[in-house]
Regions:
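Long, positively charged amphipathic alpha-helical accessory segments at protein N-termini or as interdomain linkers
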Residues: 47-77, 88-128
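N-terminal lobe of the biotin/lipoate ligase/transferase fold
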Residues: 1-75
Length: 128
């Protein structure tokens, strides 16, 4: 795990262009083709004792950021679904997952946002 290397500073961000072997809550598979999604991981070296608080905070920040940069009015169309989803018109548009390091106190929070592509049962910002 990235957090175990001990070389990255607190709140470092790692971004990916695509994802082929991601996993979500309950080990659900998460994939994203190249250039279709915003995929980022944020390292917290001194997180709160309950990682779900980070998950909820990052989910709320993602929702606020989507509303701020959207090219159309999404008022009332975005919602948080506990514990780790951002919904657009009731369909998942983003997921947030926190994973605690087994070697350190660090937590990595991952965010996947469907920008230009989404699985059949989800939403994306561009194609919605």
């Amino acid at each position: 795990m990235w957090a175990d290397a001990g070389t990255a500073p607190d709140r470092s961000v790692l971004r990916a262009d695509y994802q082929t072997a991601g996993r979500g809550r309950l080990d659900r598979r998460w994939e994203a083709p190249s250039g279709a999604s915003l995929l980022a991981s944020i390292l917290f070296l001194a997180p709160p004792p309950v990682p779900t608080k980070l998950t909820q905070a990052v989910g709320r920040a993602a929702l606020d950021a989507i509303e701020a940069v959207a090219e159309r009015d999404l008022t009332g169309r975005l919602a948080l679904k506990w514990p780790n989803d951002v919904l657009l018109d009731g369909r998942k548009v983003a997921g947030v997952l926190a994973q605690r390091s087994v070697r350190t106190a660090a937590v990595v929070v991952g965010l996947g946002l469907n920008v230009a592509w989404a699985p059949d049962d989800a939403a994306s910002l561009v194609d919605d």
